[in-house]
Amino acid sequence: MRKISLKGLSEIELQNLCENLSFPKFHGTQIYEWIYKHKIDSFQSMQNIPKKLVKILSETYFLNSLKIKSSSKSKIDLTTKFLLETHDNNFIETVSIIDNNRHTVCLSSQIGCNVDCDFCATGKMGIKRNLKTDEIIDQL
């Protein structure tokens, strides 16, 4: 059985999920807070969730859809580029740019690009697919 991502689900969807698993709805709110407020990366970090529910979640769902494959820091400023691998073995890039009093993050929303700029390798591959909600969230 293929696991499903919990990231991208709303608080109501997580409440309904808990209810469908025969747990009180309020655990859905707790899970929502662990994912989006505390930014946990494992189900075992959810300290106020019943162990039985944690076991079910870890067997059926996952939290992180991207793996950091590499990162490179600019030699001239505080820019860092991350190469990330998706669950289906595709690659995307995310860039963190720190400048004066600002912090900008450039997120990918698609795998590939159809612009085909001469200087960019990504455009040569065309568009493979749009990223899912959890893949966009995981870039942050």
Kindly give the residue locations of the regions a language model identified.
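Flexible, acidic/Gly-rich N-terminal and inter-domain linker regions that tether
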Residues: 1-103
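Conserved Radical SAM active-site core
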Residues: 92-94, 100-109, 114-140
